[in-house]
């Protein structure tokens, strides 16, 4: 099992400002974790990769790799390589299959690494099915996860309309989830939420205000009897 060094915390001091020996040790750890992932995928699936990010950038439709990628989530702790594994799971053949494992990983990672938590949430929103909505709503309602929750409202694309509307009402009030919620409202044309969207559109100038105005215009167009 590849274990990440717990001493790596770059909030106070970025990697490039650290002594060369520490930088070398960091990259050695990244290379070791990546080699482990590539070896496992080669042995399990016959895939020849230079990096786990080859799956993200060069490949699509690799159902044979999904079970091994899910196992690797528990084997690799290096955040750089774990991010590649998580991003590789945002793949059509992982829909439904990877969601439960990503929910577990989100709970474990997001409180102390919101950046990686955000990536996990993004992949989770992609692979979630209707049966995962209650667990995802619980994550969205837990403020301990902070802005790692930002992409999770997109998972409500698979929810019943009534569930999506009810959830989006309170998600619009949360600064961490508001923007993604607006986009979901626009895509699903949740006209029941027009008043809340208009309130944001009429608010202080901000890129989100412009997006809210566009969403509100789309909702008006979708409202029966609208001029």
What is each PLM-predicted segment?
Residues 174, 198-205:
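TPR/TPR-like (Sel1-like) alpha-helical repeat modules
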Residues 105-106, 202-205, 217-219:
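Short, intrinsically disordered/low-complexity patches at protein termini
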Residues 1-6:
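Non-catalytic, polymerase-adjacent accessory regions of viral genome-replication enzymes
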Residues 110-111:
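Ankyrin repeat arrays, specifically the small/polar loop and inter-repeat linker segments at the C-terminal end
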Residues 10-28, 39-62, 71-75, 80-95, ...:
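Structural detector for internal amphipathic alpha-helices that build alpha-solenoid repeat scaffolds
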Residues 37, 68-71, 100-106, 135-140, ...:
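Buried hydrophobic core positions in alpha-solenoid tandem helical repeats
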Residues 34, 62-66, 95, 99, ...:
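Core helices of alpha-solenoid repeat scaffolds
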